Amino acid sequence: MVDPSKPPTKKEIDRINRIQRDHFNRLYHLFDPPLPAGVPGRLEKIVAAAAIETGDTVLDVGTGTGILIPIIRHYEPGCIYACDLSEEMLRRLKENYSGVKTIQKDVRELALPDESIDVVFINACYPNIADKAGALKNISRMLKPDGRMIISHPLGKAFIESLRQGAPYPLDDFPLKSETKKLLGPYGFAVKKFVDQPELYILAAVKRR
């Protein structure tokens, strides 16, 4: 796992983000349904881990074409923000789901108000985040006390390992259970749930009061 306290330079972060934006702008159509067998059920487990309550404000980081959005909506949140680097991903999301507030921006640069978010999902994109320290710091700022953050992947850690060699941008590992306290503690998070199965990864954390 890359040490989040030692992020790349701003120039390198911008370069990585530009490569990812262009990559997903070209390939956004590959993320359209139908999803692989078993994935819908695992996505439901990921969203359930956040314990969304009616009226909650939810932020979906690296939302892509919005695969979590219909599941999140089952819980009747008050507002959904969807953040992604790729304008084509967000365009497809807006075609499929009305009423979602889309933001094309790196999560570390999101300017939502302090303590305004109840739940943050980082699904299938944590390894892609170039500046994890900046991302976690900003997410902590935006989350309310007792707000929940879910880092997840519906295909598990091995899927990321299979992508790493061919990816045109760096892909980090998902944190091991033994690494979570060191990773998240400095940003005020306590881990509440950890699942590391061959085809499912869930790290659920709560922002301490």
Give each language-model segment a name.
Residues 121:
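A conserved beta-strand element that flanks and buttresses the S-adenosyl-L-methionine
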Residues 187-188, 195-209:
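Core SAM-dependent methyltransferase catalytic element
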Residues 1-51, 67-71, 89-92, 150-174, ...:
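Conserved class I S-adenosyl-L-methionine
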Residues 124-125:
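Short catalytic micro-motifs in class I SAM-dependent methyltransferases
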Residues 133-145:
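A short glycine-rich, Lys/Arg-flanked "PGG" loop and its adjoining helix->strand segment in the class I
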Residues 172-187:
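Short alpha-helix
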Residues 59, 65-109:
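Class I SAM-dependent methyltransferase SAM/SAH-binding core
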